[in-house]
Amino acid sequence: PYVDEKKPSVMYADAHLAAAKRAAVESAILLKNDKRVLPLKETVRTVAVVGPLADAPYEQMGTWVFDGDKTHTKTPLAAIKEMYGDKVQVIFEPGLAYSRDHTTSGISKAVAAAARADVILAFVGEESILSGEAHCLADLNLQGAQSELIAALAKTGKPVVTVVMAGRPLTIGKEADLSAAVLYSFHPGTMGGPAIADLLFGKEVPSGKTPVTFPKMVGQIPAYYSHNNSGRPAMRNETLLKDIPVEAGQTSLGCTSFYMDAGFDPLYPFGYGLSYTTFKYGDVKLSADELKKNDVLIVTFDLENTGDYEGTEVAQLYVRDKVGSVTRPVKELKRFTRVTLKPGEKKTVTFELPVSELAFYNINMEKVVEPGDFGLWVATDSQSGNEVSFKVVD
């Protein structure tokens, strides 16, 4: 009937902490990296660590910790000082007390600290209480004065590396535009600090991909890659609000689906994520152009690391059923795999896709594979890649 007093020591065993760190490393997503500001170069001697989530151990544990013990959590500030303090001088000035803080008096102190640094590391996002079951928000912008903080830091002219800790995709387009790099860690957990520090300083290479679509603004929601096709198929590059002439005719914009003030593309598509290295996809080869319902489609392609770092790419396979008895999604993720490559290394990657996995429920609620034409993409995200085609026959 009593708690085993030895359990906490088991829970925070070295192997478990290492697993927590590995999970945080592999789930962090590099969304932007202009001029390869990351990983931080050896020429960087001073970093300014700012933001309300730079040293908030409870908040980085996430939504479902309940009675989690924050004393075992290592924050980014603590990790950077401990692991890289011998290489860089760390100046800490949070600017805001917590993520919902509207008090702007501390921003000037953060800006002063940033002016003394070579690079600014800004840790923003949302407290864990703002996410989770029954914790909905109508506004997905950064809470409090965090946007003002990022804007003020950007005015220093120093490169801003924005690290976002959050439980959902926030609408950070404005902040991303002001940042040289953006790393999205979600709520990274107990070992989030060391994981983020190693990613920033290049001991680890980002490999995470967006598990959801990031909208430009809340008006784009619902925004997801696997939406059904419609009688007005969406066009990615459409007329925006500023381009419409005065007294334009009602039919002048056509009949496709798009937002006049935002276009159709999201801020970041499903499956998106950058690396410190680059990858090249070779031509996709199919085992057959025509298959029967009991067949297995073999998909092969070459993947090459064309950059300077060893890295891991998450290669993704998408399929589209072009015509069905009911409306089908424009794309569906069917396979993905992590491929680790050294600089210059090339591997042949193989996906096996049984035709039976192309089944869906028809109007009679029968699970069926319908004959017809299909499109297939192998790509780095849900909006990339060249289409190849195959056919399913009876």
Regions found by a protein language model. Give the residues of each.
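Secreted, periplasmic, or luminal enzymes acting at the cell surface/secretory milieu
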Residues: 1-62, 68-77, 81-86, 91, ...
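Hydrophobic helix-and-loop "lid/oligomerization" segment in the mid-to-C-terminal part
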Residues: 10-13, 91-178
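Surface-exposed loops/turns
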Residues: 144, 293, 343, 370-371
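Intrinsic-disorder/low-complexity, polar/charged segments enriched in Ser/Thr/Lys/Arg/Asp/Glu/Gln
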Residues: 296-300, 346-350, 385-387
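Short, hydrophobic/aromatic beta-strand segments
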Residues: 310-317, 328-329, 362-363
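Intrinsically disordered, low-complexity Pro/Gly/Ser/Thr-rich segments with frequent PxxP/GP/PP motifs
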Residues: 325-361
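Terminal connector regions
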Residues: 354-394
